[in-house]
């Protein structure tokens, strides 16, 4: 018995061969892939300008158009045919007939073209008897021959792995996905424009670092042949950006890629887009206000409303974002824990063990508190919420709080259970920063972590004086997930990280 998959594969291979032979014959008859094709419009402009015109109005207007795109559907009805052309903006129906383009061209060329071929069209706008806006083609030209049948001809591109690996096919056949990435571009453009309009200067810092720094993450290691040294793809631009604040810039941002040699999940991709911003002479509360304003403006501009649906939740951006300290949030979502438990090492260890947290030897109260928060609280932070007062132990670059030296002037923004942003008042005491770096080195040595290195150049820069400064980092991919209602980060990254095809 022949399996359905084998049958489909046989049909696919046969069609590949037929298309290849068609191209060979086309080349024998003088076809060469054209160098260009001048369009004067696209599908969305046509629909926007002429959708409301009547049949008679279009006859009077006699609108000539030149358009190009991919043929994705076709109905041949003897001496006349309808087909659908898809371009970047949408779709438009094309009508052609033997009388207009000659019998020879219609029968020996057009009818032998395939779904997936890229065509250039010149024609006149009209409406069919059913009222569908269409183009009556006077000239047809094949621009590119498709040698592979499109996936929707064989029930779509349903395999998730293939969707990511052959993103171009997914984009051709999935209009919803195509629009997600158009919206991604709009969101990034809006953020960039918003920052510039708020007097931020966009800067660029190195992607290749001599020392990994700016975040506690495992780096990708590469090698520079000329200088004969290992280098690291950046895990964060933070330390370079703060050196620019030392140098005199007061409002800067960078919107670019970071790389972290860590796990892949619905919320994590090793290569991801971040925006980091810094404001001199401000503190973390100022940056929280700025972050809330930025997010509300993005939602209003991109979504056109202040309440949006994400997964099964309705997210309200119309009200002030909620604010909780880390301890307050743990108590709120853990009725069996009281405040005194979080201040006692033995009690907090017992709580952590009871919920399955594996405690490392060097962990003190701050580390354990953060682990309890991540395990029991984060997933419950659905509406936009700022969490503040992070322990010093997990915030090595943040300024200590004036009233409690065990916590920092730091916040993280959570939406729909995802960490979207991280910000704080920057630590500008060079001695305190040096001691924290050295403490990190001791811990890394015990854990045999060779990726944690001491950044002497950054400490040297701090000694020249970093003004009071607040910083912010926003995970752009996660934000886009929420704005486009996607549950996997892979569905908002055009080419997510995958194993090599052979593996």
UniProtKB/Swiss-Prot annotation:
Q: How does it assemble?
A: Homodimer.
Question: Which GO cellular component terms, listed alphabetically, does the Swiss-Prot or TrEMBL entry include?
Answer: cytosol
What name has this protein been given in UniProt?
Answer: Lysine--tRNA ligase
Query: Needs which cofactor?
Result: Mg(2+)
Asked whether the keyword Phosphoprotein is assigned, the reply is no
At the top of the EC hierarchy, this enzyme's class is ligase
- Residues binding Mg(2+) 1 are 412, 419
* Keywords from the named record: Aminoacyl-tRNA synthetase, ATP-binding, Cytoplasm, Ligase, Magnesium, Metal-binding, Nucleotide-binding, Protein biosynthesis
Give the enzyme's EC designation. Answer: 6.1.1.6
MF (Gene Ontology): ATP binding; lysine-tRNA ligase activity; magnesium ion binding; tRNA binding
Classification via Pfam families:
tRNA-synt_2, tRNA_anti-codon
| Cofactor binding mode and count | Binds 3 Mg(2+) ions per subunit.
Organism equals Buchnera aphidicola subsp. Schizaphis graminum (strain Sg)
Instruction: Name the gene.
Output: lysS
Q: Where does Mg(2+) 2 bind?
A: 419
Where is the protein localized?
Cytoplasm
| Recorded catalytic activity of this chain's protein | tRNA(Lys) + L-lysine + ATP = L-lysyl-tRNA(Lys) + AMP + diphosphate
Q: Name one GO biological process term.
A: lysyl-tRNA aminoacylation
